[in-house]
């Protein structure tokens, strides 16, 4: 113990320590024909008013030689009540280049699960979150406190990486509304809430430097807010063509899809004997094309299967233990990047069409993003 403490205290005297602060500011103005922005939203950082502060993200990356890295960040944003909220998103250490090709993350981190969950708001390709993240993983995605082990094997034209984590799913305060929720049973109770295990495997194949393929297989198993279990599986695939190969710049085309399914064990809160399981799936197809320097257009189609389970009669009305409505959404985005000093910032114009139960909704958004600082430790 004494030796380890001495090592940590003296390491800065000879190690190369680098601290890199980052700042990301995202805001959006928009309008929707839906009855409210909540009808077409779902994620805590989705537009929720005619003007919304999606996030002021303050971060700090730590790098110590090649063996240790870390990251901490907090996000300030306007919530669904149009009040400022603060969220500690991540705070972890990453031990790199361990024997056998392993890396270890310890602390609070966004889980590597699917194509978006591990990305911060400023890295999104669209104004709003995808339905898989917001409807299956939570209003702020899936974050856990624990440890994650990653193994990477690289070959000539291919690589394989697998990450597996175990910990406690972070339950955000917004999800615990209190007594008024007693008879408002959406799909939120299916979110992970306690012990959680996740795994993500990525297969990469570079046919050439100009044509690249990525296939991801994902799984998550853990306790849910019904005090039962949710099991989730997903697959994502992306093909990328780059005019300049591995060099920056030039035209670039990306095509992809994501398919996810979950099995939710539910229990009606008013009748402990009313229990069961329900399965639900979601699908997305997306494409983006950088057709000129600083200009990118993107399109995304999403479908969420609607499911109901656990019917109970309450004061003359039928209520369900699990109730998730069917949704279809098409989003078109046009992004213009700008150089502000050494940093990339952007303006994004997006149109979305949502097919909701009983109504269709059209929404238009203009988003701005200001980014300062180098790449963050992931």
Which residues are covered by each model-predicted region?
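Outer-membrane beta-barrel translocator domains and adjoining extracellular loop/strand segments
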Residues: 33-42, 81-88, 118-122, 173-186, ...
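Outer-membrane beta-barrel "beta-signal"
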Residues: 149, 332-338, 360-378
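Detector for outer-membrane/organellar transmembrane beta-barrel domains
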Residues: 18-20, 30, 203-322, 328
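Residues that define the transmembrane beta-barrel architecture of outer-membrane proteins
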Residues: 49-54, 85-89, 141-145, 193-197, ...
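Sequence/structural signature of outer-membrane beta-barrel proteins
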Residues: 28-37, 75-81, 113, 131-132, ...
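Outer membrane beta-barrel
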Residues: 16-34, 45-172, 195, 202-209, ...
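Outer-membrane beta-barrel biogenesis signature
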Residues: 5-48, 115, 245-253, 339-344, ...
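Repeated loop/turn-to-beta-strand initiation elements of outer-membrane beta-barrel proteins
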Residues: 66-70, 100-104, 156-160, 208-213, ...
């Amino acid at each position: 113990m004494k030796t380890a403490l001495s090592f940590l205290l003296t390491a800065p005297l000879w190690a190369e320590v680098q601290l890199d602060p980052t700042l990301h500011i995202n805001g959006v103005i928009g309008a929707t024909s839906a009855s409210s922005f909540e009808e077409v939203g779902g994620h805590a950082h989705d537009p929720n008013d005619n003007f919304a502060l999606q996030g002021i993200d303050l971060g700090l990356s730590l790098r110590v030689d090649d063996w240790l890295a870390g990251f901490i960040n907090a996000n300030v944003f306007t919530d669904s009540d149009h009040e400022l909220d603060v969220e500690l998103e991540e705070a972890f250490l990453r031990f790199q280049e361990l024997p056998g090709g392993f890396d270890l993350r310890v602390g609070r981190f966004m889980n590597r699960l699917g194509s978006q969950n591990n990305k911060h708001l400023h890295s999104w390709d669209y104004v709003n979150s995808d339905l898989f993240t917001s409807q299956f993983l939570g209003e702020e995605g899936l974050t856990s406190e624990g440890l994650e082990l990653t193994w990477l094997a690289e070959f000539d034209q291919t690589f394989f990486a697998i990450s597996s984590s175990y910990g406690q799913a972070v339950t955000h305060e917004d999800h615990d509304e209190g007594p008024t929720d007693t008879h408002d049973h959406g799909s939120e109770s299916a979110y992970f809430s306690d012990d959680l295990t996740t795994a993500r495997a990525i297969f990469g194949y570079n046919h050439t430097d100009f044509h690249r393929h990525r296939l991801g297989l994902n799984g998550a198993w853990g306790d849910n807010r019904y005090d039962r279990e949710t099991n989730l599986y997903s697959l994502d695939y992306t093909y990328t063509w780059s005019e300049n190969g591995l060099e920056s710049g030039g035209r670039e085309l990306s095509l992809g899809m994501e398919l996810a399914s979950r099995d939710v064990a539910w229990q009606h809160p008013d009748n402990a004997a009313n229990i069961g399981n329900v399965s639900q799936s979601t699908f997305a197809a997306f494409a983006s094309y950088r057709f000129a320097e600083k200009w990118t257009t993107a399109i995304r189609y999403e479908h969420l299967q609607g499911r109901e389970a656990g019917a109970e009669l309450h004061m003359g009305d039928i209520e369900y233990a699990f109730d998730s409505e069917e949704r279809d959404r098409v989003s078109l985005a046009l992004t213009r990047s700008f150089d502000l000093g050494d940093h990339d910032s952007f303006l994004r114009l997006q149109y979305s069409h949502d097919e909701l139960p009983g109504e269709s909704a059209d929404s238009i958004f203009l988003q701005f993003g200001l980014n300062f600082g180098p790449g963050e430790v992931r």
